[in-house]
């Protein structure tokens, strides 16, 4: 069936979203064009602004329009002396919803994966090491995902912390092994944070 080139382009663009296949993309495109053109325009404007204006926080690497995010510039968070290391900005959102953590974060934007050529510098561990050396930190909470790669990353960071005399702890495994942190419910995540344990080498 022949379709409008612009419609085809729209459907192909929508497929860049996770979990969106050809049928879902077609349904989304038709819905926007048939029933909600104003919503489609708002979506286009929001996407354009987000893609051009949102960058990474200079300290924690999460998404922000500012040089530093609101969490990193909060004096109370700075005095806390704790940094929670996570794999993605979505993990920060999940932890913040529990209300159980009052420190700052560091976002790896991934995890160590030697088979894929992803080493320490590729996930910002050189920058984390700079913070370990420069800031009076009390504890690094390792909240990487409970996967093989996440555990390897946590162990690497714990060894790094030991070199600088900073305590490293791992969140408890109330989080299901093999799961993604952003998909865990708030109660389970609260128990995981409360039950974290110290990692020693």
From Swiss-Prot:
HAMAP family: RecR. Residues 81-176 form the Toprim domain. One of its GO terms (molecular function) is DNA binding. PROSITE patterns: RECR, TOPRIM. Belongs to the RecR family. Transmembrane segments: none annotated. It comes from the Bacteria. The keyword Transferase does not apply. This is Recombination protein RecR. Keywords: DNA damage, DNA recombination, DNA repair, Metal-binding, Zinc, Zinc-finger. The keyword Ribonucleoprotein does not apply. Gene3D superfamilies: 3.40.1360.10, 6.10.250.240, RecR Domain 1.
């Amino acid at each position: 069936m022949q379709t409008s080139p612009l419609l085809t382009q729209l459907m192909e663009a929508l497929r860049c979203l996770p979990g969106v296949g050809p049928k879902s993309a077609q349904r989304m495109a038709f819905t926007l064009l048939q029933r909600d053109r104003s919503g489609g325009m708002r979506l286009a404007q929001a996407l354009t602004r987000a893609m051009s204006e949102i960058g990474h926080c200079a300290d924690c690497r999460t998404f922000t329009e500012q040089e530093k995010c609101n969490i990193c510039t909060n004096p109370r968070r700075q005095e806390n002396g704790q940094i929670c290391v996570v794999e993605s900005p979505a993990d920060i959102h999940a932890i913040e919803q529990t209300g159980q953590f009052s420190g700052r974060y560091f976002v790896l934007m991934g995890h160590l994966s030697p088979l894929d050529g992803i080493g320490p510098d590729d996930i910002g561990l050189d920058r984390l090491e700079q913070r370990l050396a420069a800031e009076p930190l009390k504890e690094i909470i390792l909240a990487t995902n409970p996967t093989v790669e996440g555990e390897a990353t946590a162990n690497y960071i714990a060894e790094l912390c030991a070199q600088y005399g900073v305590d490293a702890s791992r969140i408890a495994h109330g989080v299901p092994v093999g799961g993604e942190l952003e998909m865990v419910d708030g109660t389970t995540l609260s128990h995981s944070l409360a039950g974290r344990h110290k990692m020693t080498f």
